[in-house]
């Protein structure tokens, strides 16, 4: 069995951790060997938080090298573009179309790059770009954007039954937030 990899990118504090916990739980429930690692790039000052998730029959390291990731899940377009060098040719990017302006844009020193989705596609990526923030808000809370993205990611794992994702939400999310997260997952999956 080949090792599959996912690189998850985030600008929303805490979201990557929950999303990677859900993904890790799902993969473990399917008897994969799973390795997870987080890299914090001064997120409190506008840097990325990246979680690497690798899985397969046997995985020795969570680190994903450039050109090796099968998928990137990004909470913001510029973050997806920043990490595209880690995606293998023909890899999948699932990206929230939200634009979070980095400090150089906020201060007027730079402009937010345009046409990011088409540039990622031109670089050889398969891009699934949707307004997952609006999807999360439709579910009941913008904070559920991570689960909406996980719902969409689940479509790219046809070998993993949908109930495994639902069970992961039940196992990890506090009971009072489960209904909201299940709704966000379903809306994201079917977006």
Residue ranges of each PLM-predicted region?
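Active-site cofactor/cluster-binding pocket
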Residues: 1-191
């Amino acid at each position: 069995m080949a090792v599959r990899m996912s690189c998850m990118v985030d600008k929303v504090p805490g979201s990557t951790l929950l999303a990677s916990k859900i993904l890790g739980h799902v993969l473990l429930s399917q008897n994969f060997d799973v390795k997870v690692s987080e890299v914090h790039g001064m997120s409190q000052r506008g840097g990325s938080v990246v979680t690497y998730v690798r899985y397969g029959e046997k995985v020795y390291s969570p680190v994903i090298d450039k050109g090796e990731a099968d998928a990137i899940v990004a909470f913001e377009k510029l973050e997806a573009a920043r990490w595209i060098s880690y995606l293998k040719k023909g890899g999948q990017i699932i990206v929230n179309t939200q634009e979070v302006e980095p400090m150089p844009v906020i201060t007027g020193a730079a402009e937010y790059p345009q046409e990011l989705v088409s540039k990622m596609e031109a670089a050889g990526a398969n891009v699934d770009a949707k307004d997952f923030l609006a999807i999360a808000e439709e579910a009941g809370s913008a904070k559920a954007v991570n689960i909406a993205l996980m719902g969409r990611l689940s479509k790219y794992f046809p070998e993993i039954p949908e109930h495994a994702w639902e069970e992961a939400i039940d196992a990890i999310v506090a009971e009072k937030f489960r209904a909201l997260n299940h709704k966000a997952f379903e809306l994201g999956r079917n977006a």
